[in-house]
Amino acid sequence: MTMITDSLAVVLQRRDWENPGVTQLNRLAAHPPFASWRNSEEARTNRPSQQLRSLNGEWQFVWFPAPEAVPESWLECDLPDADTVVVPSNWQMHGYDAPIYTNVTYPITVNPPFVPTENPTGCYSLTFNVDESWLQEGQTRIIFDGVNSAFHLWCNGRWVGYGQDSRLLSEFDLSAFLRAGENRLAVMVLRWSDGSYLEDQDMWRMSGIFRDVSLLHKPTTQISDFHVATLFNDDFSRAVLEAEVQMYGELRDELRVTVSLWQGETQVASGTAPFGGEIIDERGGYADRVTLGLNVENPKLWSAEIPNIYRAVVELHTADGTLIEAEACDVGFREVRIENGLLLLNGKPLLIRGVNRHEHHPLHGQVMDEQTMVQDILLMKQNNFNAVRCSHYPNHPLWYTLCDRYGLYVVDEANIETHGMVPMNRLTDDPRWLPAMSERVTRMVQRDRNHPSVIIWSLGNESGHGANHDALYRWIKSVDPSRPVQYEGGGADTSATDIICPMYARVDEDQPFPAVPKWSIKKWLSLPGEMRPLILCEYAHAMGNSLGGFAKYWQAFRQYPRLQGGFVWDLVDQSLIKYDENGNPWSAYGGDFGDTPNDRQFCMNGLVFADRTPHPALTEAKHQQQFFQFRLSGRTIEVTSEYLFRHSDNELLHWTVALDGKPLASGEVPLDVAPQGKQVIELPELPRLESTGQLWLTVHVVQPNATAWSEAGHISAWQQWRLAENLSVTLPSAPHAIPQLTTSETDFCIELDNKRWQFNRQSGFLSQMWIGDKKQLLTPLRDQFTRAPLDNDIGVSEATRIDPNAWVERWKAAGHYQAEAALLQCTADTLADAVLITTVHAWQHQGKTLFISRKTYRIDGSGQMAITVDVEVASDTPHPARIGLTCQLAQVAERVNWLGLGPQENYPDRLTAACFDRWDLPLSDMYTPYVFPSENGLRCGTRELNYGPHQWRGDFQFNISRYSQQQLMETSHRHLLHAEEGTWLNIDGFHMGIGGDDSWSPSVSAEFQLSAGRYHYQLVWCQK
């Protein structure tokens, strides 16, 4: 044990937080979570242990601008100005100091290992009682599951120890410091330490005791570590549970270890042995360790599909059976290996349907409770995710237990990222930083290796490739050969990774960056000598309105066996709740707390909002990742299961044939599909169609019974096919009255019954419509070629740092946003049964023509206005965002009804999850409330739109809301938007894709760009 004087002044003088060689003082060795049961039945059933006591709750807290400002008296008693805060928490979420959001740039001046003298310091204290029985025998430990970023600990005025690495536990022996009755803890937490240079993750930088604190009482002679592993024969019909147990204390001949394996109430196997292992070298073996092997016949295998859980109970007792203590853990029988270029689980190649997940809560910062963790797991399971990467640090210990039990594959990642270093491997190639890196990797493995859900270890994130990585890779492979190791840094395919694990590599496009080229994922597989599997550690950057092109990845994953999936970036938007002057909550991002440096809204890349409300993109991910695939041939549907281990036993296939959204026939068939098997379903003959319209077949896979992660009726998969467009003859309608044209110096006015249309002869636009005496338009109907930029359109552009390659900057530079219409033609003609208005506009900027738009408006006796639009795009202008029409309608109706793709927002490169049907939603649901306002709410493939008294027909895309594109473009936060008068309608003949391979470079695939020189579309606008 390190002995340091109790004086605060001496501790401050040592400056342990600026010494990379000091990662801890007096911290106990890492191990799996302990509870020290004194009853084996309680250990088996995982009941609360009387030896494990939570210290969560209200603590006294004082904040200081630097550790030197802390008075010595604080070690002995609470300060008069102390506040009360809840532990666990981040102090920034209680109004102390400010959270800082930055992605790459360090929030402090880069001068490792030194940190600023202005180093915000939180002083926590707690008074608690200890029963004398805990002091008479045994060892009392204190466990801090997470403290950011470093801390010194005192107990009853005496210095105990020091710890850093904010994402792993720090555990200390308090036995020598405690007294019976009242005791006082004092914890001095520093915001910055040399460890901060290894924690440069893309996240909010927060501080404090943000995970659980607990006391644990262990006997003097105790279990100090145990490790379980599962071994199999070739066909997995027999297994061995291998348990290695280590003890601490007096080694007596009478000591025994019993390991029992349970499945529910049934004991499957048991074994007992004294301590002492096999001979290791010429000096012998470990006297304080023992390894037992338990044979298990026909084990029920663990997988994310069927997470069969056993329970292993480890008992330390005397030869006569007197129990000293018991520890326990969940066990999953499973094998992970790489063979022939494939990552295998239980002998079958995995397809990773993964997502990255930060520990984030909009109200509580980085504090995770069980409810939030379960909510995240249910979201993943319900949306067909089977894997999660703990980006970029070990998670709360409970997370892994929940993943074991619900069934998720976990990449457990060390708390190492040096993204802001130049070069990035400046620290990871420096032997002075090897001790700190070693602690972060080895202690993660020692804590989490008993969890079956952990199938891959990760050495960290974005830290270049250094010799320290190679050393730690070899250590893991030596200590735990049962799992692969991955690491992306240095090019994603270095000697420190068993898996090619690039981030944001594209399907077909190479990105030949210097030193670390990012090949297309297809090309990577074919590089000479390369035989590793490829799993993208990050892909499909889900920032704002994104995830375009997601289907392209999944087509490749299913086509090439060694492309074994990836992890979407990421699950949850990292916005935080702030309150305005009236106490109303709003969502904040980088810079909103006065934090500098900051990376603005780049913290919001989630498939769900911070409150876990889904983004529309989540449905696209769910659909592409679904475990059932479908093929239609005539009236035969072939259903293929992508489950590797699960026979469908809770699925019904519902099918519906509908004509323009009106069901004609339907049925349901139970699915009985073996793992990786097929089922063929024959549909009945369909009735002869008498009506015109689009005929669609839709299938849904429904779970009739609830599961651990879904309610009854959950839809797990779906597909839709367009069967035909019925073109039966429509009888001519009766003759109508002929609309009347009136021409004035300023307008063309067309009247029919109680309707009027007015075209301004100076602008050439439809300037007004009347139904009776009610005006229908607040702004004219005009061309629209722009959109409120998406995050993907903006890229890395900022007001002070323009990226000329970003779509929005190209559009701005070309004048798309500033273009004005020059009228070239505006004529009116009376036909035999209609009035025809013809207009031609040149959309210009600074004398240059960007677009020419030719439109005809044919208003006939039925009151229909048929609009035909032809647009020419200048060859030297950037591809436009959209080609369409926009206006502000006077009405605000409650609901929107349309026949087209829905119900969720969809875009040309993100619409595979949308279904063609007749949809009806509240107007408010047509707007997607992205925290950073942008273009949103598009619905593609629309044949008919009904809103208020109006109907539009054709083949178009539309969005409709109370917010104009201009307001969306000019507003920084959604809570600052105000509902405008009337309703804004955008009808597009064509709309560019949204992209999403990443959010910092143009990523819209060529096939979804508006690259043609001419465009033609048409629609009919009438009143119902």
Curated annotation (Swiss-Prot):
Binding site for Na(+): 202, 602, 605
Pfam families: Bgal_small_N, Glyco_hydro_2, Glyco_hydro_2_C, Glyco_hydro_2_N, LacZ_4
Positions of Mg(2+) 2 binding: 598
GO cellular component terms listed in the entry, alphabetical order: beta-galactosidase complex
Active site: 462, 538
Cofactor notes: Binds 2 magnesium ions per monomer.
GO process terms (BP): lactose catabolic process
Entry's family note: Belongs to the glycosyl hydrolase 2 family.
HAMAP family: Beta_gal
Name of the protein described by the UniProt record: Beta-galactosidase
Taxonomic path: Bacteria, Pseudomonadati, Pseudomonadota, Gammaproteobacteria, Enterobacterales
